[in-house]
Regions:
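Short gly/ser-rich loop at a beta-strand->alpha-helix junction or flexible surface loop bordering the NTP-binding
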Residues: 1-89, 110-113, 120
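Surface segments flanking catalytic/ligand-binding clefts of nucleic-acid enzymes
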Residues: 67-183
Length: 183
């Protein structure tokens, strides 16, 4: 069919596939990242990498879905690409790995982060990389007021005492979330 595309590789990087059962092999997230480097710009590949390293997945026709755990990490993607000497797309993938982050919880968090920290030549403002969904513990003396023991900051620069929250209407429109966010 027109939706199937075959690719030839002369030598596959180690751990490119996992057995999905009954001998059916599928590409690992790390190998998918490297394969997509042939088709995407650096900025698009970074966005894809943050999805792989995040707790959400974009759906083709509908809202994103949540995942319990990321499919991979920025460190695993970087190590895989570094070990794939001579692979098609490797130069693009290596460049993209410099900008990967772990822990994005939504596509909009990813886009906001990319806008803020990617360099100007990749469409961003060039700020330092933030930490995503960074845990900030609430001091015991303030927990009653805060009604929680910790907060997760969408984007955080702890050294600058700066946090940025992306408040989507979809995620924050529930009455329970609105009262929680108001605090």
């Amino acid at each position: 069919t027109a939706s199937l595309v075959s690719h030839k590789w002369t030598s596959l990087p180690a751990s490119s596939f996992v057995d999905a059962g009954q001998g059916f092999l599928v590409s690992t997230p790390e190998f998918c990242f490297l394969q997509m480097a042939r088709e995407m710009t650096v900025a698009q590949l970074v966005q894809f990498g943050l999805e792989l390293c995040g707790t959400y997945a974009l759906a083709e026709n509908g809202p994103a879905i949540s995942r319990e755990a990321p499919l991979t990490t920025a460190a695993k993607l970087r190590a895989f690409v570094e070990a794939a000497a001579g692979a098609p797309g490797r130069a693009t993938a290596l460049r993209a790995t410099r900008y990967l982050l772990d822990g994005s919880a939504s596509a909009m968090e990813t886009l906001l982060a990319l806008l803020l920290y990617l360099p100007n030549n990749l469409g961003g403002y060039g700020l330092k990389k933030p930490k995503l969904n960074y845990r900030v513990d609430v001091p015991a003396s303030l927990r009653e007021l805060a009604d929680r023991s910790y907060c997760l900051c969408d984007l955080c620069w702890p050294e600058a005492n700066l946090a940025v929250e992306y408040d989507s209407r979809l995620h924050h429109s529930e009455p329970g979330r609105q009262s929680s966010d108001a605090r």
